C-alpha cells in the first residue's frame, strides 16, 4: 500500500483542512494510505508580535517545507492566503481545492452588525487590510491587535476583551462555528485577502509521483480566480501582510477582478476593477494593479 504523508500545522483549522485533503485523496485513490504529520511553526508560537515583525506569514510554511526537504513529509496543506507570493525552489502547488466562502465575518456577542457597534467600540484584528476597511467604515472604532488561532481569538472575545472581532467566514464554517458569525462583511463594500477561503496543497516539483497523486484535487475555476488575485498583489509588490484586498469571480466565460489598497492609519481606500480572460490571469491582475497605481496606491503602500 502506498502511503502519503501530509505536513500540517497543529491548529484545529489547519488539521481540519488537512483531513479534508486527506479524505479527498482517499476517495480519488482507493488503497492510498494518507497520514497527517502535525507540526508547530514559528508563526504559531510567537503571538506577542505582529506577523510582519517576525517575518510574515511565510513563517507558517517554513517548517513544513523543511519537513518535505528532509523526507519527513510528501506534501503540505495551507490556507492559500498565507502562502507567499513566490515559492522557494523546488516547491510547487499542484492542487488548489474548490474555494470556500471568501468573505470576512464580524463576530460579536452583543452586536449584530458593524453599524450597530457603539461609538468607540473595541474591535480585534491584526490584519492591516481589515483595519483599513474598518477605519473607512467606522473611524471611531478602537482597533486592537489580535493574534492566535480561531478558538484562541474567540476565547479572547468571550472573556470580554473586545466588543467584536473580525475573522474569515471560511475558517468559522469549517470548524462548525457558523452560529458565531454576526454579520458577513462582503463584496463589493468589503474585500477579502487575495486567495482567502482557498486551500492549497504544496509539494516538491521534482517529485512527479506525489505531484500526480495531488493534481486530481485541483479546481480549475478556483485556481483561475485566486491566481488573478495573487497576480494583482504581486504587481503591487505586495505580500501577505499589507493592506491589499482582492476578489475575482467568474462572469460568463471570463473573470471580473476587484482590487483594493488601503491605509490602516486613516482609512483611505483605493479601488479598481477589470474584466479579463481566465487564460491570462497575470494580465488581469496587472491591469487592476495599474488601475490602483493610477489612483495613488503607491503613496499608500510607501507609507507603511
Curated annotation (Swiss-Prot):
The protein's Enzyme Commission number: 2.5.1.61
EC class name: transferase
GO biological processes: protoporphyrinogen IX biosynthetic process
Cofactor(s) named in the record: dipyrromethane
Pfam families noted in UniProt: Porphobil_deam, Porphobil_deamC
Entry keyword set: Porphyrin biosynthesis, Transferase
Cross-referenced Gene3D superfamilies: Periplasmic binding protein-like II, Porphobilinogen deaminase, C-terminal domain
GO CC terms of this entry: cytoplasm
Pathway annotation: Porphyrin-containing compound metabolism; protoporphyrin-IX biosynthesis; coproporphyrinogen-III from 5-aminolevulinate: step 2/4
Known catalytic reactions: 4 porphobilinogen + H2O = hydroxymethylbilane + 4 NH4(+)
One GO MF term attached to the UniProt entry: hydroxymethylbilane synthase activity
Co-factor: note: Binds 1 dipyrromethane group covalently.
Family matches, as HAMAP family: Porphobil_deam (MF_00260)
Assembly behavior: Monomer.
NCBIfam families hit by this protein: hemC (TIGR00212)
Role: Tetrapolymerization of the monopyrrole PBG into the hydroxymethylbilane pre-uroporphyrinogen in several discrete steps.
Listed name of the protein: Porphobilinogen deaminase
The encoding gene: hemC
Amino acid at each position: 500500500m502506498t502511503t502519503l504523508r501530509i505536513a500540517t500545522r497543529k491548529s484545529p483549522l489547519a488539521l481540519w483542512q488537512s483531513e479534508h485533503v486527506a479524505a479527498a485523496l482517499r476517495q480519488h485513490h482507493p488503497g492510498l494510505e494518507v497520514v497527517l504529520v502535525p507540526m508547530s511553526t514559528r508563526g504559531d508560537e510567537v503571538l506577542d508580535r505582529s506577523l510582519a515583525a517576525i517575518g510574515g506569514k511565510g513563517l507558517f510554511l517554513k517548517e513544513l517545507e523543511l519537513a518535505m526537504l528532509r523526507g519527513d513529509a510528501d506534501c503540505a496543506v495551507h490556507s492559500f492566503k498565507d502562502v507567499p507570493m513566490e515559492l522557494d525552489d523546488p516547491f510547487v502547488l499542484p492542487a488548489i481545492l474548490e474555494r470556500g466562502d471568501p468573505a470576512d465575518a464580524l463576530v460579536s456577542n452583543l452586536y449584530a452588525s458593524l453599524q450597530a457597534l457603539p461609538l468607540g467600540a473595541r474591535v480585534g484584528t491584526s490584519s492591516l487590510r481589515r483595519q483599513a476597511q474598518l477605519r473607512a467604515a467606522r473611524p471611531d472604532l478602537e482597533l486592537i491587535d489580535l493574534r492566535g488561532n480561531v478558538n484562541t481569538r474567540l476565547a479572547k472575545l468571550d472573556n470580554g476583551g473586545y466588543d467584536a472581532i473580525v475573522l474569515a467566514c471560511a475558517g468559522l464554517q469549517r470548524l462548525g462555528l457558523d452560529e458565531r458569525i454576526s454579520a458577513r462583511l462582503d463584496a463589493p463594500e468589503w474585500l477579502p485577502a487575495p486567495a482567502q477561503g482557498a486551500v492549497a496543497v504544496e509539494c516538491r516539483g521534482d517529485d512527479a509521483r506525489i505531484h500526480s497523486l495531488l493534481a486530481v484535487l485541483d479546481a480549475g475555476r478556483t485556481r483561475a480566480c485566486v491566481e488573478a488575485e495573487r497576480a494583482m498583489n504581486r504587481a503591487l509588490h505586495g505580500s501577505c501582510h499589507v493592506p491589499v484586498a482582492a476578489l475575482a469571480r467568474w462572469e460568463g466565460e471570463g473573470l471580473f477582478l476587484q482590487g483594493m489598497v488601503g491605509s490602516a492609519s486613516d482609512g483611505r481606500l483605493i479601488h479598481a476593477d477589470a474584466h479579463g480572460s481566465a487564460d491570462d490571469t497575470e494580465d488581469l491582475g496587472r491591469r487592476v494593479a495599474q488601475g490602483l497605481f493610477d489612483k495613488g496606491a503607491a503613496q499608500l503602500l510607501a507609507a507603511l
